[in-house]
């Protein structure tokens, strides 16, 4: 028999015997340490339940939406958003959404943007170097 095969088989046999001896012992899920942790976990669970009930009571105290105004009316009303909420960025957002952007860029199409950024072909590219 080859010495390398004999060594590997011997190691496998020793590993198997070691694991089989460990398997003969019982390993309960709950040990003596888990019994001492139980009151602490129970107290934590009680505090969590109290906190959840407080939050639910607080949500019920929050003033509900007015009965005459629906969700769509609230969303569309100008009073729903503060006056300075959109601010100066609103016009920029509208410009980006509009179809004029493609006409102002001078590009043949969106797919040429990568070519245009490298060589300037197909777009009126302003170099800022």
UniProtKB/Swiss-Prot annotation:
One Pfam family matching this protein: ANP
Disulfide bonds: 107-123
Family matches, as InterPro entries: Natr_peptide (IPR000663), Natr_peptide_CS (IPR030480), Natriuretic_peptide (IPR050787), Natriuretic_peptide_brain (IPR002408)
Keyword Lipid biosynthesis among record annotations: no
Extent of the signal sequence: 1-26
Family membership: Belongs to the natriuretic peptide family.
Protein name: Natriuretic peptides B
Organism: Ovis aries
Gene: NPPB
């Amino acid at each position: 028999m080859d010495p390398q095969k004999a060594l590997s088989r011997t190691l496998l046999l020793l590993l198997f015997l070691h694991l089989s001896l460990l398997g003969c012992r019982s390993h309960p899920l709950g040990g003596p340490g888990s019994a001492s942790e139980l009151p602490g976990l129970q107290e934590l669970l009680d505090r969590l339940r109290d906190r959840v009930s407080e939050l639910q009571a607080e949500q019920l105290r929050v003033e509900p939406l007015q009965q005459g105004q629906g969700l769509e009316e609230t969303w569309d009303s100008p009073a729903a958003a503060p006056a300075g909420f959109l601010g100066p960025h609103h016009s920029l957002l509208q410009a980006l959404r509009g179809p004029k952007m493609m006409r102002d860029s001078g590009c043949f199409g969106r797919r040429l943007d990568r070519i245009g950024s490298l060589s300037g072909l197909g777009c009126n590219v302003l170099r800022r170097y």
